[in-house]
Each structure stands twice: as C-alpha cells, then as structure tokens.
Amino acid sequence: MSRAKSLRLLALPLGAALLAAGCGGGQAANLQPGDATATSAAATTAPAATAPAAASGPVAPLTGLPTSAAVAARPAIAVRVPLTGGVGLNDADIVYQEYEHATLLKVLAIFQSKDAAEIGPVGGVRPADPSLLPSLHPLYANTGGASGTEGLLEKAAIPQVTSSSAGSAYRSGTGGLMTSTTGVLAAAPRGAKAPPAVLPMAGTGEAFTTSHAGKARTVTITPPGAPAETWTYSAAGRSWLRSGTPGVAVANLILQNVPYKEVLLRDPDRFAQSARVLGRGACTAVSGGTATPCSWYKRSAAAVTGYVDAAGVPLRFTHGPTWVVLLPPGSKLAVG
C-alpha cells in the first residue's frame, strides 16, 4: 500500500469549488481540492434516498438493514453524549461529531433501529441542532439549553423529551443523567413519526462504489489544535473502527468540511462555536475499503444532506451505521 497522503481541508463558502479527484486502484486516495466541480443539477436536486433495491421486507430508514415493520415505523431519538466516556454510541444509526475551539464536543447520536439500554451522560442543546435535526424529525432527549436554541427547536416542531419535562425517562448515573431508547419512547408525545431514508443505499450485497474512489485502509483526521483521530478498516467486519475509547464500528464515515461560527447564546449568556451545516462544501466519503472525494449540500434545515461524487452522481452507501465528522477549517486528512 502506498504511504498516506495528507491534505489541508478548507471550509468552502456557498458556490465555491468542491473537492474532486481520481484515485487509482491500490493507491492512497489522492484528494486534492479544486480538481473538478459538481454539476449545478447535483447541487440543487436532492438524490432519492431509497431502500435497497433487493430488499424483500421492511428496512431501517437510517441504515438500510432489514428489520421488523414495527421498528421501521418508529421515530428516531437524538441524544447528545460525550465521545469520551459516552455510553450507547455503538447502538446509534448516525452520529454527528462537532468541535469547539479545538475541543471535541459531545456528539449528536441518532438512535432508531436498535434499542440502547443506557445512553449518556445526556447533554444539552447545541446551536447546530436546529439545523441538523428537522430533516430527521426525531424525539430529542436533552437536559435543556440556551433559550434561543430551544426556541428554534420548538419552531421546527422537534418534540423534546427533556430531563425537566419527562423525568421518568432519566436516571442519575456516573457523570450525569442517563436515559434509554425505551425510556424516551415511553415518555414521548404522541404523533411522532419515522425518519426518512436520509442516505441513498446500495442494493443488498452491493458495496459502496464510485468511479472516483480509491482504496483506503486508514483515515487520520487532525483538526487544528486537536489530537489526531484514526479510523482503521476491518475487512473481516466490513466496518471502520475508531481508535481510542470508546471503540466504535461503523459502515460509513463521512468527513464533511464545514465553516464554524461564533454564536451568542442567551439565558445563560455566552459565546459558543458552532458548525454551519446549511449550504454546500467539500467532503470525503469512506465506505468499505474505499474513499472518494465528494461534495455535500443542504438547502434548508428540513432538507436532508445530499452527497455527490465529482461527476455529480449521488453516492450510494453501504448498509449500516454512519459517522459524520463536521470538520472545521484548517483540518488535515490523511487517507492510506
């Protein structure tokens, strides 16, 4: 295998050139910014997020994996938990990883297809949540937040199962309050619905493929001022394993290049750094033993995020859980 090649990821403004590259078989992904631009149609038309073509029964909307009709129809649950010391992440279908001032924040974990007996310690609302969550219309379990962010969640009609309004869904644990999927569902208001299929999935038995992909066995990301984080591909498990504690395994890894902005929060008053997930930008998608440069776009909080390759073709991901890293400007990425 060739040595890993590093690149500097720069947050791209709306309409800027997007990452693209060609990768030869057996070579580390040669991900260079500005080699090509996604088509305008790809940037304005959301891909159809479909279930696997060969599926003969119900599938989980966020993973594409076979499940029961009852599970497929139940709502998703969103919970912020710390990455270090967090419990329940291996049961999540989607995880969003965000940074603040070079410090890794509590990740936003989305549960739908699996029951998690213990999740936590449960965190509060973050400024990015009103932009991330509406497309999933989940039940949001949280411990509260600044008045402005909570108001935006209410405006987006995101049902909240908070520690103050639904205490029966929580229990005291080491480091804070803990919850569970059954506890949140039992305390949830009526009328919650299942999320849409937010990622197009490859057909049953098919791998993540694109003509722009190259072989990948390790992925190392280094945000400015933060420790490096390495993911390693397990061919036996057909999954990507995150280094460190807790160990997590996912089918898909999306390294999404986004701007960050200082946000003034009220009640309590403080500044917070928040990922800006609306607009478009560059990304790298990793699935199976391959990685490909791509571009992402999200037109509104209610719209799902679309991912297309350098030719503007929607990516079709491997069945299973997905981890999305919201990379700040100046981050470095090495794919080997």
Language model features: what each stretch is:
Residues 1-11:
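Bacterial N-terminal signal peptides that target proteins for export
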Residues 19-22:
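C-terminal motif of bacterial Sec signal peptides marking the signal peptidase cleavage site
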Residues 24-27:
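Bacterial signal peptide processing site
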Residues 34, 55-66, 70-92, 103-110, ...:
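A surface/extracellular/periplasmic glyco- and lipid-processing/surface-interacting theme
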Residues 36-53:
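Extracellular mucin-like PTS domains
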